Amino acid sequence: MKLFAGNAIPELAQLIANRLYTSLGVAAVNRFSDGEISVQINENVRGGDLFIIQSTCAPTNDNLMELVVMVDALRRASAGRITAVMPYFGYSRQDRRVRSARVPITAKVVADFLSSVGVDRVLTVDLHAEQIQGFFDVPVDNVFGSPILLEDMLQQDFNNPIVVSPDIGGVVRARAIAKLLNDTDMAIIDKRRPRANMSQVMHIIGEVADRDCVLVDDMIDTSSTLCKAAEALKEHGAKRVFAYATHPIFSGQAHANIKNSVIDEVIICDTIPLNSAIKALPNVRTLTLSGMLAEAIRRISNEESISAMFEH
C-alpha cells in the first residue's frame, strides 16, 4: 500500500498517513508557468496498491485535474490498483436534470472522467446523493461522517436535546442521528428556496421550545440556510443551537453569515480545508475523519468489508 496526495487537503492526507504508520509517496505536483498541472512520481510504484488522497473542493477544477493527472501518471508507471480517496466529491449537487431543464448532469461527467483515466475504485464521504455511486463503472465506497459527529454529540452536555433536519431531504439522516443520540426527538424545518444558494425558512415541524437544537446536514455552503434555520429555532424558543455537518464548503458570505448568526457552535469535519477567517471564528470547531478514512483504506487494501465499519 502506498499513499499519494494532491494539493487540496495536505493536512488530512498527512494525518491519514500517520494513522497508517506510513509516509506519503514522493510526488511533485506543481504548475508550469502557464498554469498547466505538472506531476512527476519520484518513486517506484510498479504493481503497487495505490491511494490518491484529494478532495475536489475549491478550486474545484484545479483539484479535479490534479487528481486525474496523478492517476494517469501512476497508471503509466504500471500501478497495480489505484483508489481515488475523495473525502469531498465536487459537483455532487449536479446529479439530475430538474424538470428536464437543459442542464448537464455534471456528477456523471466527473464519474466518467475518473473512470476513463484509470481509477479502479473510489472512496468518498457522505455523497450528497447516494445514487451517484451508480454513475461510476468502478466500485464506490461511500462512508459516513455521522459516527464521528455522533461521538462528539454524545460528549456534549446538551439540555433536553432535539435533532433538527434543516430540510425534508435530510430527514433520513436526522432520524438516524436522533435514534443513536439516546433516541431523542426530531424536528424538521420546512423551507422554500427561491434561487440557488438562497433559502427562506417557512415553519418548524416539531416542538423546540426550551430545548437544545442539534442541526445535522451533509454540508454547509454559504450557510444562509443554516443561519436562517437557527434564527427560526431561536424565535420558537430554542435555548441553544448546534450545527453539525460533514463538509465545510463555506463559500460566498459564509464567514459573515456565521459570524453574525445566533448559532452557538458549528461543528464540521476536515474534508475541506478552512481559510484563516473561518478558522478564527470562535464558534467553529473541526473534527478529523483521518482515523475513519485510514481504517477504510486499510480495509480496502486488505480486501476487508467496509460496511462492517458502520454496523451497530
Curated annotation (Swiss-Prot):
Its EC number is 2.7.6.1. Its cofactor is Mg(2+). D-ribose 5-phosphate binds at R193, D217. Mg(2+) 1 binds at H128. Keywords: ATP-binding, Cytoplasm, Kinase, Magnesium, Metal-binding, Nucleotide biosynthesis, Nucleotide-binding, Transferase. One of its GO terms (cellular component) is cytoplasm. PANTHER family: RIBOSE-PHOSPHATE DIPHOSPHOKINASE FAMILY MEMBER, RIBOSE-PHOSPHATE PYROPHOSPHOKINASE 1, CHLOROPLASTIC. This is Ribose-phosphate pyrophosphokinase. It comes from Baumannia cicadellinicola subsp. Homalodisca coagulata.
